[in-house]
């Protein structure tokens, strides 16, 4: 749904993991065999989810994983949708060597992804080579066949570093580059080279020249009125802390001209910062996965999810508004979060982002809105 021509609206989601257990509930499940220590069959994750929240009506339709989120998004004026696709799309390939947890979705289940209508999928992450170069090749081809641009991984380093360009209206574009850091669990052997497929991998974000290189690559084709985004897979699965080197890296990207940093890797949301008028999402958390019923880390409430909606002034690249849609997963399906869960998310995001001067308020429509504390004070 096209938005206001005077602004650029981007929908951002974190990790979308449509493989493994989620793939098994879709109309065309792939091979369920796994090589995990505690689970040898992907249908086991379906049983875990059902044990917690009730029976899943197999097979589900394509819209099922997105659930109630779609009704909200279909009434939202969005120009571009960007997610981190953390699964391969393949029925082929070999399990990655010495990697116990591997994700794949059958190519015939791609309509479950296109139900969200993403424009760009970031692929620089620690699962895109779960089924080797063949799995990566199949994923890129499946996305292209569905009309979705992919960034951050490809046939060689040149392809992995190539940005996606999405035209907004007649003149403006959103430019997206996708990068992974070793801190997210991407092995050095997955790094793309001039003569080898792989991901755009950076070793140490704290090095100033690394941020300069990423920014220069993404900004190479930027014109006045364009919005430039770096989608960054970094950090551990759990925890709210932001590494000083990651903060410095994000700041340097924005100092160089990047308009938005889209962070992901953690299974729950991490802090938000508005730096020089530009948003930094240090971790968007999971959107779709098969983790229901898996114990541990309960204090992070990973069953609660957020989708992020940014509105940007293309003339300056500055953020106009940042809203979040609170969701809860049940039976591998997203539903609107309750008022209690929404308040928990509001309080948590505000608390962990306090060092960056962020306040979070609940809107009358039960969306959350990020407000820099200085702006909030000036209105009171």
UniProtKB/Swiss-Prot annotation:
It comes from the Bacteria. InterPro entries: Capsule_synth_CapA, CW_Biosynth-Accessory, Metallo-depent_PP-like. Pfam families: PGA_cap (PF09587). Disruption phenotype: Disruption mutant shows reduced PLG content in the cell wall, increased sensitivity to chemical and mechanical agents, reduction of biofilm formation and attenuated virulence. SUPFAM superfamilies: Metallo-dependent phosphatases. Keywords: Stress response. Induction: A member of the dormancy regulon. Induced in response to reduced oxygen tension (hypoxia), low levels of nitric oxide (NO), carbon monoxide (CO) and carbon dioxide (CO(2)). Expression peaks in the late log phase of growth. Could be involved in the biosynthesis, transport or localization of poly-alpha-L-glutamine (PLG), a cell wall component. Contributes to stress tolerance and virulence. Belongs to the CapA family. This is Probable polyglutamine synthesis accessory protein Rv0574c.
